[in-house]
């Protein structure tokens, strides 16, 4: 094999690994209950593939804290991350209820309808409401 063939083979292997890493990223990771900030993150592999995921944690004061924490996780997997927006989530597991609302001052408002669709993949038996009201 010449150098070009070896390089091409190596790049295909890296691309396959990043595709597998992307496939392994959970769509939803949020706090088990309470009211907390969330961000939508577009996770991108080494090629053109990407997926939107939802992250929200009660222990994070700012939307940027959530993004920074998760971006480090994605970097270790060889993935890139972009944040198109955020908001807040009210999570009441006893009532099987989620409410998505508000916006991020730093990132802007996430697409709450898309957030609802993504949350429904993990919480199919929940009532999920969205609102453009509130901060």
Curated annotation (Swiss-Prot):
Biological source species: Drosophila orena (Fruit fly)
Function: JanA and janB regulate somatic sex differentiation.
Recorded GO MF terms: protein histidine phosphatase activity
Listed name of the protein: Sex-regulated protein janus-A
GO cellular component: cytosol
Record-linked InterPro entries: Janus, Janus_sf
Binding site for substrate: 37, 104-106
Active site: 63
GO biological process: cell differentiation; sex differentiation
Alphabetically ordered keywords of this record: Differentiation, Sexual differentiation
Keyword Protein biosynthesis among record annotations: no
Record-stated family: Belongs to the janus family.
Domain of life: Eukaryota
């Amino acid at each position: 094999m010449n150098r070009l063939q070896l390089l091409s083979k190596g790049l295909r292997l890296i691309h396959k690994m990043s595709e597998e890493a992307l496939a392994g990223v959970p769509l939803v990771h949020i706090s088990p209950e309470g009211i907390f900030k969330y961000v939508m993150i577009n996770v991108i592999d080494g090629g053109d593939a990407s997926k939107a995921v939802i992250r929200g944690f009660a222990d994070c004061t700012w939307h940027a804290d959530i993004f920074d924490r998760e971006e480090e996780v994605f970097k270790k997997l060889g993935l890139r991350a972009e944040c198109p927006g955020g908001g807040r989530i009210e999570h009441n597991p006893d009532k099987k209820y989620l409410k998505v609302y508000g916006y991020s001052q730093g990132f802007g408002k996430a697409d709450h309808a898309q957030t609802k669709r993504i949350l429904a993949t993990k919480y199919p038996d929940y009532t999920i409401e969205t609102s453009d009201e509130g901060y």
